[in-house]
A protein has these predicted regions:
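N-terminal small/polar loop signature for handling phosphorylated ligands or for N-terminal nucleophile
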Residues: 1-2
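Structural motif
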Residues: 5-7
């Protein structure tokens, strides 16, 4: 017998520090591992595998530029700056080198354990028949 479906779980790069280890994204379009950090791998999609792919992603890393941008936007919002001014100011502060430096929280092990349990419980509730 061959597989009827693939369920792929992947770590994602967050676009906001507020989402780090706090959201779970689900899609039926598959995933391209490493694409969020510029480390592209072969796609895991229905097109490539010939069977449906459900992708579950958890933002577990964030680039340094995002951390700085979130911080600066917070400061500028407190000072009631105009949105256009805020964005221009933040972009001028962020070095392109910071877009390639990724960090995670110091409690990543605990967060991954908690998130993996949550995902496994959801999958069990979905696919394991109740007796």
């Amino acid at each position: 017998k061959s597989a009827m479906m693939v369920i792929a779980v992947d770590a994602l790069a967050a676009r906001s520090i507020k989402r780090l280890n706090r959201t779970i994204q689900i899609t039926d379009t598959g995933i391209i591992p490493g694409s969020g950090v510029g480390n592209y791998r072969n796609a895991i999609t229905e097109e490539h595998l010939g069977i449906p792919v459900i992708a579950i992603g958890i933002p577990t890393v964030v680039d340094a530029a995002t951390i700085i941008a979130d911080f600066c936007m917070g400061l500028m919002e407190e000072n009631k700056s105009e949105p256009e001014e805020m964005e221009a100011s933040v972009r001028s502060l962020i070095s392109p080198k910071l877009n390639t430096m990724y960090v995670t929280s110091k409690d990543i092990d605990e967060a991954v354990n908690r998130l993996s349990f949550t995902i496994s419980e959801g999958l069990n509730m979905t696919f394991v028949p109740r007796v």
